[in-house]
């Protein structure tokens, strides 16, 4: 590093008088630069102001031509309506018109914007480009999978891939799978859609294409795949489940086993049904069921509302006679009274809670089930009215307790029976006393039920 202080000290007085002071020169240069910069900034600001004024005037003129900008909103609404119209498919079944909305991916395919290609490593330029696009998507969407492993399987000639390609040649997503024709199943190795394209239904539409293609071109009837926790939901929607019905001898040792993955299976439908027509097929099934229901029921009939209340708000009606269609539906006053009757008694909730706490108490184990006659031969000779917690639970569930008094009687019966049969030095006697004390404290803590202890 240069020592500036030392260098400046060796300069002679004559040299200082014979040259321009460096500090003064630098200061003048800085001030000159600042003045020049300020001038340039003012000019630039003036130019910006002029430009902004011109843009503002242009915008005002454009808005005036478009009706103040409201025309843009109208155009957007028209575009949305047109999009909805394109997505809606209608058909007629038995004189009734039905409609359903197609996925955006289906619409894009119909318009020729995307296509579904089946590719493998055949060394052609276009196939390799598609496979490379798939490889990049898999590596990005499956970060826990080794990149080299993904590359090896995607380019492997024993594997096939179905890719979603946006024209001319942009890969959006795809599935790489390995078919085992002689064993009638295929293993789905990778399945992913680009993160920017996951809201248009590409995943479901891709799987439907793959199923139809495999059934039409091979003997494959089943799909097997290992799904991670994030993919299980997707595969369930596509007809996969965790129950593997395919015999282990068919697939064991043939598919790749992934640690932490969940093995899932899809059994495909008969070839007479196209998966790509699944939305229409489901709607046809619904229409057929509704037709059968209409033959047996009048629930679909819409009757006019009652007009009597418009003139007389306090009018009294005979429901069966004055309300059209009510009697035909099978309604009766008895049914109405039965429906309004509470299913449980007013004390049910408290009794359920109290019985649950008694059952879970550490001292309750001797009273959980009836006394075994084979273990205690003379018990039922001494105790004429036996009771236990499981019997109380059964009676409570079957609405045998009309009042809390009856419930409390059975609970006390358990403790009294125990103390009558067992000596006061036994564990059974002590447990009965502990559990009864616990029950009394619980009842005492309830303001609504504490008075039962005084009875």
UniProtKB/Swiss-Prot annotation:
Gene name of the encoded protein: GCN5
UniProt-recorded Gene Ontology molecular function terms: histone H3K14 acetyltransferase activity; histone H3K18 acetyltransferase activity; histone H3K9 acetyltransferase activity; peptide crotonyltransferase activity
CDD domains: Bromo_gcn5_like (cd05509), NAT_SF (cd04301)
InterPro entries named among the record's database cross-references: Acyl_CoA_acyltransferase, Bromodomain, Bromodomain-like_sf, Bromodomain_CS, GCN5, GNAT_dom
Organism in which the protein naturally occurs: Debaryomyces hansenii (strain ATCC 36239 / CBS 767 / BCRC 21394 / JCM 1990 / NBRC 0083 / IGC 2968)
SMART domains, alphabetized: BROMO
Chain ranges of the Bromo domain: 342-446
First-tier enzyme category under EC: transferase
Site (Important for catalytic activity) residue list: 187
Signal sequence annotation: none
Main location: nucleus
Keywords per UniProt: Activator, Acyltransferase, Bromodomain, Chromatin regulator, Nucleus, Transcription, Transcription regulation, Transferase
Full protein name: Histone acetyltransferase GCN5
Statement: the UniProt record of this protein carries the keyword Repressor: no
């Amino acid at each position: 590093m240069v020592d500036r202080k030392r260098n400046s000290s060796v300069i002679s007085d004559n040299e200082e008088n014979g040259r321009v002071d460096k500090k003064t020169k630098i200061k003048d240069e800085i001030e000159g630069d600042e003045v020049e910069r300020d001038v340039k900034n003012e000019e630039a600001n003036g130019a910006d102001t002029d430009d902004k004024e011109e843009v503002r005037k242009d915008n005002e003129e454009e808005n005036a031509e478009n009706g103040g900008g409201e025309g843009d909103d109208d155009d957007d609404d028209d575009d949305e309506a047109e999009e909805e119209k394109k997505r809606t498919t209608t058909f007629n079944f038995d004189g009734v018109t039905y409609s359903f909305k197609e996925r955006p991916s289906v619409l894009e395919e119909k318009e020729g914007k995307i296509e579904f290609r089946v590719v493998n490593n055949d060394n052609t330029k276009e196939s390799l480009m598609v496979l490379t696009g798939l490889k990049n998507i898999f590596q990005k969407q499956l970060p826990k999978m080794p990149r080299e492993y993904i590359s090896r399987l995607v380019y492997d000639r024993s594997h096939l891939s179905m890719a979603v390609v946006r024209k001319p040649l942009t890969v959006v997503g795809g599935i790489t799978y390995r078919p085992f024709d002689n064993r009638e199943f295929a293993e789905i190795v990778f399945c992913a859609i680009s993160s920017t394209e996951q809201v248009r239904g590409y995943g479901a539409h891709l799987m439907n294409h793959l199923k139809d293609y495999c059934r039409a071109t091979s003997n494959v009837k089943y799909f097997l795949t290992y799904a991670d926790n994030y993919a299980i939901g997707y595969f369930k929607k596509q007809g996969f489940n965790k129950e593997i019905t395919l015999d282990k001898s068919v697939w064991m040792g043939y598919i790749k086993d992934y640690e932490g993955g969940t093995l899932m299976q899809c059994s495909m439908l008969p070839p007479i049904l196209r998966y790509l027509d699944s939305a229409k097929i489901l709607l046809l099934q619904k229409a057929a069921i509704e037709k059968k229901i209409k033959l047996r029921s009048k629930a679909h009939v819409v009757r006019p509302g009652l007009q009597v209340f418009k003139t007389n708000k306090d009018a009294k009606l005979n429901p069966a006679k004055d309300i059209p269609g009510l009697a035909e539906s099978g309604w009766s006053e008895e049914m109405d009274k039965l429906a309004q009757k509470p299913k449980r008694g007013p004390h049910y909730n408290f009794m359920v809670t109290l019985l649950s706490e008694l059952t879970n108490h550490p001292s309750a184990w001797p009273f959980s089930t009836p006394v075994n006659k084979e273990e205690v031969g003379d018990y039922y000779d001494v105790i004429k009215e036996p009771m236990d917690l499981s019997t109380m639970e059964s009676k409570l569930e079957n609405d045998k307790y009309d009042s809390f008094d009856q419930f409390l009687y059975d609970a006390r019966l358990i403790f009294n029976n125990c103390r009558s049969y067992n000596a006061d030095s036994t564990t059974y006697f002590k447990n009965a006393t502990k559990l009864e004390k616990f029950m009394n404290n619980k009842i005492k803590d309830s303001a609504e039920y504490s008075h039962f202890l005084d009875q």
